[in-house]
Amino acid sequence: MKTLGYATQTADAPLGPFAIERRALRPNDVAMEVLYCGVCHTDLHQARNDWGWSMYPLVPGHEIIGRVIEVGSKVTRYKVGDAVAVGCMVDSCQHCDQCRKGEEQLCREGNTQTYNDRDRITKDVTYGGYSKHLVVREEFALRVPDGLDLAQAAPLLCAGITTYSPLRTWNIGPGGRVGVIGLGGLGHMAVKLAVAMGANVTVMSRTNDKKAKALALGADRFLASTDAEAMAKAQSGFELIIDTVPVKHDVNSYIPLLDVDGTLVIVGQIGLLADHDPLCHGTPPPGGIADRRHCANPGAARLLRAKEHPARLQDDPNGPDQRRVRATGTRCRYPLPLRDRHGFFEGLIGKPSGRENTMRSNHCP
């Protein structure tokens, strides 16, 4: 299948149109028209080769929402017209112990990432959701619940599952004592999910700048980590702390906040941690397909709908909407036309605000 994507050719190049040849459908494949694709900060890291393993041309995008347009001969889960979602994985061996128990992200043979990876069979480079069409194994497509706004569902595929997985793994429920460090794209998801699970939620940040936003999202309390007295009073107060901060930082000051048998899960960290005790935290990869299906259920998904109106980028990179994306603000995600990809993607450079954004294919309603 020939389709159009948007790729970067080098670590310092902007996104540009790129012709993609999607594979012919295998028996268990579905082909989908991409309607929306979330913009994750991982996309920028990969495009800029921040981690040293980017393969160019690189087509980012792993928060993908679309509709099925064709199915393979053995597909049983989906039919043409179904709304589906694809996250950061598109394949795994499906027979190892981890895959059999729904932990495909821990596949013994290695899972296949949606982009910047190699197909398990052909070894061709995988290209992501910044494109008009995608072909994926049916086991790695998720059904989008009826009635859910497709644009707002996209960030569930990365930010959503990344924060939902530890809440589910550590059995958070009514009365659970949860701390969330940071209030960007991951942090606001963690707060809304934990609140929906009935937990008692405290948001932590260096200053009080995000206090009002945290409380508006449903958090019970706000804790400024630079307030020594408040931090001391909070000792032993949490059974789970989810650290969503995406830059190098010292986690040691948060360890005393954990109760006996408490856990600090680091989901936002990029790069090396400052000195710390590795026995005091967990760093699981984003959840498996089973977790993703739970995260995308109608009840959980509806709770994550953004309250803000969608923003649109203008072609003028100095236009007001572009400044709004560049500025540090409280908005969480924006549906954006793919035709405006240049100004938006470049607007993220050097500004790791952690917000989740969504691009819309310009041929979609």
Segments from the language model and where they lie:
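C-terminal hydrophobic helical "lid"/dimerization subdomain
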Residues: 1-3, 294-352, 356
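Glycine-rich beta-strand-centered segment in the early N-terminal region that forms part
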Residues: 23-37, 50-100, 105, 127, ...
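NAD(P)H dinucleotide-binding glycine-rich loop of Rossmann-like/cofactor-binding domains
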Residues: 77, 93-181
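Adenosine-nucleotide cofactor-binding segment
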Residues: 174-183, 188, 193-253
